Amino acid sequence: MIRRGDVYLADLSPVQGSEQGGVRPVVIIQNDTGNKYSPTVIVAAITGRINKAKIPTHVEIEKKKYKLDKDSVILLEQIRTLDKKRLKEKLTYLSDDKMKEVDNALMISLGLNAVVHQKN
């Protein structure tokens, strides 16, 4: 079963403009209820072209810890809904601590941090 925090290889083509494309790693960010029942899944692209977070929506992942080819960055500004048929193979899964970083970057990407601060 596909779970939130899993890292898969996925085929992201075709793309337009600045979208991440080709077969590349993605992290599952959709909740597990959606993962169980929906034919689609929400993912964030991972790139190995940069190995350091450059903006607040980036999360670094280490190649040794996560068995990747190179140090990489999760791009939480590059979120896509994919048909599950685009997922090729599971590579690894992210730790709870790393998923907290993903959640924080996702909140920034979607502007949810402003909503939280306004309620306080």
Swiss-Prot record:
Recall the GO molecular function terms of this protein's record: DNA binding; RNA binding; RNA endonuclease activity
Give the record's subunit note.
Forms a complex with MazE which is no longer active as an endoribonuclease.
Family named by the database record: Belongs to the PemK/MazF family.
* Keyword annotations from UniProtKB, A to Z: Endonuclease, Hydrolase, Nuclease, RNA-binding, Toxin-antitoxin system
GO terms (BP aspect): mRNA catabolic process; rRNA catabolic process
Pfam short name (any one): PemK_toxin
Q: What SUPFAM superfamilies does the database record attribute to this sequence?
A: Cell growth inhibitor/plasmid maintenance toxic component
Report the gene name.
Answer: mazF
Protein name stated in the entry = Endoribonuclease MazF
Domain of life (superkingdom): Bacteria
Q: What is its EC number?
A: 3.1.-.-
Q: What's its job?
A: Toxic component of a type II toxin-antitoxin (TA) system. Ribosome-independent, sequence-specific endoribonuclease that cleaves mRNA, thus inhibiting protein synthesis and inducing bacterial stasis. It cuts between the first and nucleotides of 5'-UACAU-3' in single-stranded RNA. Neutralized by coexpression with cognate antitoxin MazE.
